[in-house]
């Protein structure tokens, strides 16, 4: 069996080694460890500004998630490759457990405040049942919104690239100048897709931090 072309037996051999061997604080850090710590600190400062200090324990996992999403998004821009994050099933598999973890953590640590979000302060008494239903639905729709947003943005960009590249290929024999203009548009759109891949990975992770 394979996962994205990588044999699972290879992953099973390498992963325990990565978990077992950690850098010691008594030894001087190498360049790789220093770079990893710098990346973690930089991203943590950006992502966790609205989060209190106890929430910073999520930093390593969410940064790993963002790097994973960025890698998967960029993978689809290579020729003859498939973008895993254009599949709603994969995005939901990432969004739903993490969203559920934030909800359960909030209910465990601050149950009153978590349940208080279902009823905004100052709500008129007749509207209380309706607002509780609306806030509950909006709470449960969050993972779906995360997954659909990522899927829709990446799929739309890839479809545009496919259509414009097909148009350039068709116009090349008969209308070379029009094909050249189409290729220029294709290059600009590819640059835009690179930016979208980065932004979507950041937004996915940022929204999860806001749910904390």
UniProtKB/Swiss-Prot annotation:
InterPro entries: ATP_synth_F0_asu, ATP_synth_F0_asu_AS, ATP_synth_F0_asu_bact/mt, F0_ATP_A_sf
NCBIfam families (UniProt xref): ATP_synt_6_or_A
Gene of this entry: MT-ATP6
Summary of subunit composition and partner proteins: Component of the ATP synthase complex composed at least of ATP5F1A/subunit alpha, ATP5F1B/subunit beta, ATP5MC1/subunit c (homooctomer), MT-ATP6/subunit a, MT-ATP8/subunit 8, ATP5ME/subunit e, ATP5MF/subunit f, ATP5MG/subunit g, ATP5MK/subunit k, ATP5MJ/subunit j, ATP5F1C/subunit gamma, ATP5F1D/subunit delta, ATP5F1E/subunit epsilon, ATP5PF/subunit F6, ATP5PB/subunit b, ATP5PD/subunit d, ATP5PO/subunit OSCP.
Transmembrane helix among keywords: yes
Cellular component, GO annotation: mitochondrial inner membrane; proton-transporting ATP synthase complex
Pfam families per UniProt: ATP-synt_A
Transmembrane segments: 3-23, 58-78, 87-107, 128-148, 154-174, 179-199
GO MF, any single term: proton channel activity
Coiled coil segments of this chain: none
Protein name (record): ATP synthase F(0) complex subunit a
Origin species: Tropidurus montanus
SUPFAM superfamilies: F1F0 ATP synthase subunit A (SSF81336)
Reported function: Subunit a, of the mitochondrial membrane ATP synthase complex (F(1)F(0) ATP synthase or Complex V) that produces ATP from ADP in the presence of a proton gradient across the membrane which is generated by electron transport complexes of the respiratory chain. ATP synthase complex consist of a soluble F(1) head domain - the catalytic core - and a membrane F(1) domain - the membrane proton channel. These two domains are linked by a central stalk rotating inside the F(1) region and a stationary peripheral stalk.
Gene3D superfamilies in the record: ATP synthase, F0 complex, subunit A
Reactions it catalyzes: H(+)(in) = H(+)(out)
Keywords for the protein's UniProt record, in alphabetical order: ATP synthesis, CF(0), Hydrogen ion transport, Ion transport, Membrane, Mitochondrion, Mitochondrion inner membrane, Transmembrane, Transmembrane helix, Transport
Family designation: Belongs to the ATPase A chain family.
GO biological process: one example: proton transmembrane transport
Topology versus the membrane: Multi-pass membrane protein
């Amino acid at each position: 069996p394979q996962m994205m072309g990588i044999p699972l037996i290879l992953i099973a051999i390498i992963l325990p080694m990565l978990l077992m061997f950690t850098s010691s604080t008594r030894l001087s850090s190498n360049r790789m460890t220093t770079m990893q710590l710098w990346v973690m600190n930089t991203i943590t400062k950006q992502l966790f500004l609205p989060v209190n200090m106890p929430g910073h324990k999520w930093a390593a996992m969410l940064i790993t998630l963002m790097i994973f999403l960025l890698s998967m998004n960029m993978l689809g821009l290579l020729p003859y490759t498939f973008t895993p994050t254009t599949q709603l099933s994969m995005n939901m598999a990432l969004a739903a457990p993490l969203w559920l973890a934030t909800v359960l953590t909030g209910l465990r640590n601050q149950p009153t405040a978590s349940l208080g979000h279902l009823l905004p302060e100052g709500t008129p008494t007749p509207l209380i049942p309706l607002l509780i239903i609306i806030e509950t639905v909006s709470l449960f729709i969050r993972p779906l919104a995360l997954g659909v947003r990522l899927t829709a943005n990446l799929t739309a960009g890839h479809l545009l690239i496919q259509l414009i590249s097909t148009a350039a290929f068709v116009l090349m024999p008969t209308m070379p100048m029009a094909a050249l203009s189409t290729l220029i548009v294709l290059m600009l759109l590819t640059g835009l897709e690179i930016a979208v891949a980065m932004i979507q990975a950041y937004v996915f992770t940022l929204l999860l931090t806001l749910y904390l």
